[in-house]
Amino acid sequence: MGRRAWTLQCTAFSLFCAWCAMNSVKAKKQFVNEWAAEIPGGPEAASAIAQELGYDLLGQIGSLENHYLFKHRNHPRRSRRSALHITKRLSDDDRVIWAEQQYEKERSKRSVLRDSALDLFNDPMWNQQWYLQDTRMTATLPKLDLHVIPVWQKGITGKGVVITVLDDGLEWNHTDIYANYDPEASYDFNDNDHDPFPRYDLINENKHGTRCAGEIAMQANNHKCGVGVAYNSKVGGIRMLDGIVTDAIEASLIGFNPGHVDIYSASWGPNDDGKTVEGPGRLAQKAFEYGVKQGRQGKGSIFVWASGNGGRQGDNCDCDGYTDSIYTISINSASQQGLSPWYAEKCSSTLATSYSSGDYTDQRITSADLHNDCTETHTGTSASAPLAAGIFALALEANPNLTWRDMQHLVVWTSEYDPLANNPGWKKNGAGLMVNSRFGFGLLNAKALVDLADPSTWSSVPEKKECVVKDNDFEPRALKANGEVIIEIPTRACEGQENAIKSLEHVQFEATIEYSRRGDLHVTLTSAAGTSTVLLAERERDTSPNGFKNWDFMSVHTWGENPIGTWTLRIADMSGRIQNEGRIVTWKLILHGTSSQPEHMKQPRVYTSYNTVQNDRRGVEKVVDSGEEQPTQEGLDENAQASQSPSGSGVGGRRDELAEGAPSEAMLRLLQSAFSKNSPSKQSPKKPPSAKPNIPYENFYEALERLNKPSQLKDSEDSLYNDYVDGFYNTKPYKHRDDRLLQALVDLLREEN
């Protein structure tokens, strides 16, 4: 073939490709039933053309004079082909200078294009922070994040906000914390100096504060550990748990530098042993009051408190006066499974929930650790409270003028019910808010909270009012085992007075109760709107004869309700211990709220699906308040229904279903691992575990049954087995709680072999 012929062929092929490409581009266009035209004659001429040619005149195009938009009366709304004949007829009109059929144009927002969440940061443990990004690898897991990333993408990262962690010290020279360390938010109350550095020991006992601070303020993009929720905030440490704690010390740390510190995060409290009743002393209480009145230049300090880890001990955080305070935001935990973890306590004062550790195989929380190290094993409500504090720091950066009560309202109004809806105990109160004794108003949603706090739209809540309701003629009433005292409390909520209340916030029932066995008491309060709240559930380990002395039982479950009407209080003992006796000596009902409805509550709260992908696991029927345990699943056997027993050995002040057939292979591997601990030959890493150890299935299930039988636990101070669960959780596949419980199960199996 000659050079000329080859050149002609190449040219022809190129022209053909160009023609194909041009037609391909045209084919991709979506033409719409709209024509733009330039008509110098103005609106009268445009109207005449429309009438003559079969168009509807849609009007002038923006501010362009003599440019009009038309819609043809007999043409489809969208088409892949242009209507050239219609365009030609319009453009051929002498009154039209130019005409063109409109088509869809693809446009992209010119924001910074972001990689996947996994690639946002170079910190090595970022991809393990499952609670900040949806990293689930299993379809059965619910959506797992606190919606923090959308807030960061707005440029809100905690700048200008100061948080102090009240704990056992802070390793402030840690390379993932140092850049955000604030010495003005720090003090050592154990050694009375300005250096909160923790005391090192062989077991790293004082790691707690550093871990909590890291969750809040770990530096981003520094190739170290992970990323803090408010990674540009300033963080300080108060060292106070590594020594003697007094009321004076607590008052000093709660009121430390309130003009500088915005948020105080505390992951500790009285002993979570299921038998302690204790709250702030006189001085600490005054420090709380001073903080909310004078802190942050009068806007009020934000106090965040972990709700407690006494679940296994059958504890109830209504007996903890720190989480039960109207001045604190009490935060509970949810596991990676979206369930209430084994250590979580139930009470009517919990405001909201954050993520933390759960069952033995669940992921835990990532943070900084002692000796400039990192950890992925931070646990308990200790880990939940700092996450909440970080989210509140984001809100304060967005709106520094938020008051302490604004923050509580924001939490109530934006926390999510949907991701935790698989759990029992949810109820809708008289104001239309979903609430639960385990989770408060639900899982924190950082984006929703920050969006609502936008200073351009947020209206600060009205002035706080307090109305006290009591019966001056009340005579002490006797209570015995299997008995109940019912008190009807009619109230007009101080109507007509300066302190009248029409919209509730906190409700306190202050009482003095003398009783021979305090832990057998059950207290329920029903509001005028019909919301029933358990103020105190039974605590099997609480054998104290001391009762309650002017104790404030606090509830947030009636938030937003109108209190006018008759309230009903029930105090009962259904233990069957016939020797029990006592009396209700005094009581008063304290209503906290506002005389007018807050602006954001004038429209009802609308709940939307948090996780549309993972709704197939839903199916929880409506149940009564979680404190009034009622099984919600069919087919519960007697042992499962009865499994609410006392718990085991006390813990410190820090707030660190049987399927049919064979046990799961994962369960058997865990058991085999535990069996191997006492045999050196089986500990060799070179010998992989067999798929299924030789454990008779009937023994396996018998051991599980024994773990859940109340008869094995009654009056036992040293029990390790109590899961503090109701019938609902007993129908779930059994999950190991920790190494001690695993070993206990193994020991039971060995007894039979």
From Swiss-Prot:
Its cofactor is Ca(2+). GO terms for cellular component: extracellular space; membrane; neuron projection; transport vesicle. Disulfide bonds join 225-374, 317-347, 467-494. The active site is at 167 (charge relay system), 208 (charge relay system), 382 (charge relay system). Residues 28-110 form a propeptide. It comes from the Eukaryota. It is an enzyme of class 3 (hydrolase). SUPFAM superfamilies: Galactose-binding domain-like, Protease propeptides/inhibitors, Subtilisin-like. Its EC number is 3.4.21.93. Residues 617-657, 676-695 are annotated as: Disordered. It is found in: Cytoplasmic vesicle, Secretory vesicle. Keywords: Calcium, Cleavage on pair of basic residues, Cytoplasmic vesicle, Disulfide bond, Glycoprotein, Hydrolase, Protease, Serine protease, Signal, Zymogen. Residues 460-597 form the P/Homo B domain. It catalyses: Release of protein hormones, neuropeptides and renin from their precursors, generally by hydrolysis of -Lys-Arg-|- bonds. Residues 1-27 form the signal peptide. Glycans are attached at residues 173, 401. GO terms for molecular function: serine-type endopeptidase activity. Pfam families: P_proprotein, Peptidase_S8, Proho_convert, S8_pro-domain. One of its GO terms (biological process) is peptide hormone processing. Residues 129-450 form the Peptidase S8 domain. Belongs to the peptidase S8 family. Furin subfamily. Involved in the processing of hormone and other protein precursors at sites comprised of pairs of basic amino acid residues. Substrates include POMC, renin, enkephalin, dynorphin, somatostatin, insulin and AGRP. This is Neuroendocrine convertase 1. It comes from Bos taurus. The gene is PCSK1.
